[in-house]
């Protein structure tokens, strides 16, 4: 189980990313369309002045149950440990144990 503070920190980052997503996308679009190097520099400064945690790169995928940050399966939103337990219990529709 991950520390509650780390889980809450990631939730805060997710809220921050959602809040600034439109502004960041507009600035990036303007940056890509700008022809003048000075204009590009000014837009780049505006992007840099956005909060650091508003960047999607700083978000970390975590297991919804345990908060574990590693071995995360996007399709399920779970870590491998919970995925294995739930699959054995039959709680994941369509997931079957492999045999060949």
Swiss-Prot record:
One of the record's GO cellular component terms: cytoplasm
Keywords annotated in UniProt: Ribonucleoprotein, Ribosomal protein, RNA-binding, rRNA-binding
A GO molecular-function annotation: structural constituent of ribosome
Annotated GO biological process: translation
Entry annotated with the keyword Ribonucleoprotein: yes
Pfam families membership: Ribosomal_S14
HAMAP family: Ribosomal_uS14_1
NCBIfam families: PRK08881.1
Subunit details: Part of the 30S ribosomal subunit. Contacts proteins S3 and S10.
Protein family membership: Belongs to the universal ribosomal protein uS14 family.
Function noted in UniProt: Binds 16S rRNA, required for the assembly of 30S particles and may also be responsible for determining the conformation of the 16S rRNA at the A site.
Name of the protein in its database record: Small ribosomal subunit protein uS14
Gene that this sequence comes from: rpsN
């Amino acid at each position: 189980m991950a520390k509650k503070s780390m889980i809450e920190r990631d939730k805060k980052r997710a809220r921050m990313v959602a809040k600034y997503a439109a502004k960041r996308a507009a600035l990036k679009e303007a940056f890509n369309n700008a022809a003048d190097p000075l204009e590009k520099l000014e837009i780049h400064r505006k992007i840099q002045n956005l909060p650091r945690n508003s960047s999607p790169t700083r978000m970390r995928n975590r297991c919804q149950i345990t908060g574990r940050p590693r071995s995360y399966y996007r399709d399920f939103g779970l870590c491998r440990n919970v995925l294995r337990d739930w699959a054995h219990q039959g709680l994941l529709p369509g997931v079957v144990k492999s045999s060949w």
